[in-house]
Amino acid sequence: MFCYQCEQTAKGEGCTKIGVCGKQPEVADLQDLLLYALKGLALHAVEGAKVGVNDHETNVFTCEALFSTLTNVNFDPARFQVLIPRVVEYREKLKAKVKAAGGKVDFADPAATFTPAKTLEGLVAQGANVGLKSEPELPPDIVSLKHTLLFGLKGISAYADHANILGQHDDAVYAFIYEALAATLRKDIELGDWLKLVLKCGEMNLRTMELLDAANTGVYGHPVPTSVPLGPKQGKAILVSGHDLKDLEELLKQTEGKGINIYTHGEMLPTHGYPGLKKYAHFYGHYGTAWQNQQKEFSKFPGAILMTTNCIQKPQQAYTGNIFTTGLVGWPDVPHVTNRDFSPVIERALALPGFPETVNGKSVMVGFGRNTILGVADKVIEAVKNKNIRHFFLVAGCDGAKPGRNYYTEFVEKVPKDCVVLTLACGKFRFFDKDLGTIGGLPRLMDVGQCNDAYSAIQVAVALAKAFNCGVNDLPLSLVLSWYEQKAVAILLTLLYLGIRNIRLGPSLPAFVSGNVLDVLVKNFDIKPITTPDEDLKAILG
């Protein structure tokens, strides 16, 4: 195996024996083989588009399959053993349609005619030959951009999958995914053209996040400021982790009147702000912090646990009988719920003791999406003009286990009192429960939402720039970002596509970005690694 798609990759270079995430070598090889098969399918899809062939079922499946290879989603080799032959089935159906329409179906690349082995061992062996290091003859900078594109596609596919579940999709997004996957098979693309493809990936991710925003707000309403208790309520309990709003809604419906309280974990926290979800009286509070603390936190949770998307870690013995997966999530021997029938989860929750008493602890505020912030835009603009607000910081992104991530806690603690902190994604758990007070009736710490709500933050920035008659880069706004997995890669590419400059990125830079590619990013976008909170605040504020 060789994998370096996440921030915690071994030694900052790559995982070769086992993934730091817990991914076994055979799963890494199976994921590489799945990607290879998808590239062969993409060749046919690109040609199909030229003759009017477009199959929605294939499009949706492609995103699901790509999403399955994202960090901390699916660790179950048996699931990949099913997925890989399905790619070939979809490819052959598509091939027949393209041929019937007069399109090209003969390709020189062997990915187009790939035949999967009949056994799991055979598939693993095939995967070992088509991984990220299978093209040693290519220049390192080409490989760097090619892999950046591939990881960005994984991020897009995750958001496209969530949007499609709620009825929003755009064929242009699927067309780009195929175009980019097919491009990764080529060896004749120049460096400049790879860079264009990478930035186009950012453009298409912006469109995909727009679709997901429309899906979430269209179905559940715009988030509103909501206080979420961090202490438990006496009674039976189910904990929901991940990102999928539809899964959460179905669980809320199925548990209504059963005496079970529903708690969020990780990136599910912002869902408390959606009117269509918060209307359920038993949708109670939030438990725990970010994904990397789940083994400790889940061990103490006295109810059932449902993982809806990434991020799952190896379940500990203390809760192996209590945890369930659904959707694209998989872990060997963990019960998997299909078709959103959460009966097994509910039965387990009823059998477990639940919380013995109500604890009136802290609470946190969520629901500061674009609709909420732009609803008080006049207050914000006035506060800036009156110099009550000096600067805005978007301190956002993924959390992780590295000690260096304490930077983000310290940074927020040291932000001057005349500055506002916007946050989103699970990086917020480094400081989400801190009371930073208010400025002119506005909270100094505002939770914009999940990682995909970067779209919301972008819309706020664009609206403020318009109000001040300047560019986004001219606003008193600084982006201090943390990254971990491939959705963060896609979001970073979106920011670069938009021409956002002076982004501070940490806790370490991606292993897949070569020195020369980094130089290009620094030269064109002034992207820089984080240093210390004091140094960075001084550089930003003077």
From Swiss-Prot:
It comes from Syntrophobacter fumaroxidans (strain DSM 10017 / MPOB). SUPFAM superfamilies: Prismane protein-like (SSF56821). Its EC number is 1.7.99.1. Gene3D superfamilies: 1.20.1270.20, 3.40.50.2030. [4Fe-4S] cluster binds at residues 3, 6, 15, 21. It is found in: Cytoplasm. The keyword 4Fe-4S applies. It is an enzyme of class 1 (oxidoreductase). The gene is hcp. This is Hydroxylamine reductase. Its cofactor is [4Fe-4S] cluster; hybrid [4Fe-2O-2S] cluster. Hybrid [4Fe-2O-2S] cluster binds at residues 243, 267, 311, 398, 426, 451, 485, 487. It comes from the Bacteria. It catalyses: A + NH4(+) + H2O = hydroxylamine + AH2 + H(+). One of its GO terms (cellular component) is cytoplasm. One of its GO terms (biological process) is response to hydrogen peroxide.
